[in-house]
Amino acid sequence: MYVEAARLTLTIGALGIVFATVVGILCSAVEYYRIPVLRHIVSVYVELSRNTPLLVQLFFLYFGLPKIGIRWPAELCGIVGLAFLGGSYMTEAFRSGLETVEPIQKESALSLGMTPVQTMWSVILPQAMAVSVPSLVANVIFLLKETSVFSGIALADLMYVAKDLIGLYYKTPEALGMLVIAYLIILLPISILGTVLERRLRYAGFGH
């Protein structure tokens, strides 16, 4: 049971994080280039996303949208909800990284004939991502832990299975113990990998 639940948690979590990263890159680019109108939309999105719980967002998608004729499976609601929440955190992480890149580098790239898009993807973003590694890893861990609320929309994630074992067999210590172990198995390698990457990037001249 825990293996299947872990697979579901990882699959939905990974997809949500991938989309959150894409949203974060796009939104941080909008803020970096101060694009009119869009930057205000991004600001509203970031504030809305960061100041509402994931469970409320999931309830809106799973229970609210059907009221207007839009029905999504629970898995899709989980992915979209996690991407919506994570996108705002990734936006702030990338924005902080972008601010560390010296303006002269952008100006030099543009003077060499590179387009703004080429400058962003080839010059600015790689440096920003390197500096943002600690924040990005922290966000990934945070978002994977947030998947524990998926049981609220009937997704058979790790928390759902633990609740089932407690409710059906009254094995509270065993269920909670397995839950802790499962999350450690998932999250600890990510934390270690993040530490290794941070050290290597620091030795390479990125970060502080």
Regions inferred by a protein language model and the residue ranges of each:
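Transmembrane alpha-helices and adjacent helix-loop boundaries
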Residues: 1-208
